[in-house]
Amino acid sequence: MAAKIIKFDQEARNCILKGVNTLADAVKVTLGPKGRNVVIEKSYGAPLITKDGVTVAKEIELEDKFENMGAQLVKEVASKTSDVAGDGTTTATVLAQAIYRQGAKLVAAGHNPMEIKRGLDQAVEALVAELKNISKPIKDHKEIAQVGTISANNDKTIGDIIAEAMEKVGKEGVITVEEAKAMETTLETVEGMQFDRGYLSPYFVTDPERMEAAMDNVAILIHDKKIANMKDLLPVLEQTAKSGRPLLIIAEDIEGEALATLVVNKLRGVLNVCAVKAPGFGDRRKAMLEDIAILTGGKVISEEVGFKLENTTLDMLGQAKKITVDKDNTTIIDGYGAEADIQGRVKMIRAQIDETSSDYDREKLQERLAKLVGGVAVIKVGAATEIEMKEKKARVEDALHATRAAVDEGIVPGGGVAYLRALKVLEKLQLAPEQQFGVNVIKRALEEPIRQISQNAGVDGSIVVDKVKNGKDAFGYNAADDVYVDMIEAGIIDPTKVSRSALQNAASVAGLMMTTEAMIADKPKEEGAMPAMPGGMGGMGGMGGMM
């Protein structure tokens, strides 16, 4: 085991503070509407220019191991806030730095760090309750657009596109962000349930111009195995041909004789049919087939539950108003499933989302949920250059997260005003004298976001803090226009979830750093002297003959 270096007490806390300050000072220049950019060197390609706090934080790695520990702990604050709320990373970093800087001074002066932390925790609890109290629910298109605009660094176009996407696919809908081929940023929406499987043969196409199969009032056969043998499929084909309805077959695969027969019948006009592979793989495929069955009011024809393909009857088939299938995707619009069954399925998927610990599984479950209840919207981000596109795409993703957070928990006045308004709740706290120091730490720290926003805008932070403190309700400083306004009316708002998460995560990590008494790191390996070069380059004499 490698030898370790250990640092204690004040020396350890000073190292943490240096690391915290280095990282926070690089991140906090990006805060607010007049925040500056940070340029990050990349090992290949052009440097990355960003105004996103968490991107800056993730790039920082310090040479000194002990200082690096401090930096990494604050990085954790930014990452955690980004994971929970999708935004507020810079605010969280600024708060963590302010809390730790104040707390470290008190500990150095001989105060008990554990008591300070207790006071800190109680203050945060009271502040979170007060933020929820100040919070106002968000409903209309205009407010959603305002949240998106603020999070996208005052880009109104992005705010409007996000609000439109939310309106079209609903709160549970999936909104994805992709890079566009053109310069414009556009929105595409898909109604109903879409999955990424296209037709198995181009002969199923009904609209040659658009190369898609479109069918109305469709019966849907959902099967979880391969279909290769025609005699298994024949009974259900005869029944649907008699009913005169088009048929969509969704199965693990359709091949050989079965596929050939379907194509021949389609070309002869005997049967309007289309076949696609089932979406997903393994257990996820089974779950998605069940989703389709519930949405369309049909059953999954599976031998596991005692249904055989040859015994399938018309009442086991799903039904939908319209289906379109192109070479890559199948879209089912207006399935005939019972509303109660769909809601039951939605409830079950929501429970699974809450229980899962895997981010990948959660994302896939949310996609399934969206397909059942809302739809899917795709924001295609366009820009003149690749560097600008990457920066813009990151802003759109930030704004999207913030908007979802706002719809979840409501909004509070932005620009750091909500923190100043919540301060009044701390006057009511009755704590022991040592714990009161923890409350004082947080009181000063909550002024830091508005102070930093003002400084980035080239204004004296202390004057702004003083003026806003003396105001009421949503009165605050609009750094973009250098005026004092009603923040809610001016559309300068923050999602409550973002403000709350930033404060909780910052206080949690800063409290842990404050109560740190020892630090342990690996001892750097000493570089030995370089080995001597071997003597003489023997054996090279014979190279004269190469002329």
UniProtKB/Swiss-Prot annotation:
Entry keywords, A to Z: ATP-binding, Chaperone, Cytoplasm, Isomerase, Nucleotide-binding
Cellular compartment(s): Cytoplasm
Example of a GO biological process term: protein refolding
GO cellular component: cytoplasm
Pfam families assigned to the protein according to its UniProt record, in alphabetical order: Cpn60_TCP1
Documented EC number(s): 5.6.1.7
Source taxon at top rank: Bacteria
Gene Ontology MF terms in the entry: ATP binding; ATP-dependent protein folding chaperone; isomerase activity; unfolded protein binding
Assembly and oligomerization: Forms a cylinder of 14 subunits composed of two heptameric rings stacked back-to-back. Interacts with the co-chaperonin GroES.
Family to which this protein belongs: Belongs to the chaperonin (HSP60) family.
Name the UniProt record assigns to this protein: Chaperonin GroEL
Species name: Citrifermentans bemidjiense (strain ATCC BAA-1014 / DSM 16622 / JCM 12645 / Bem)
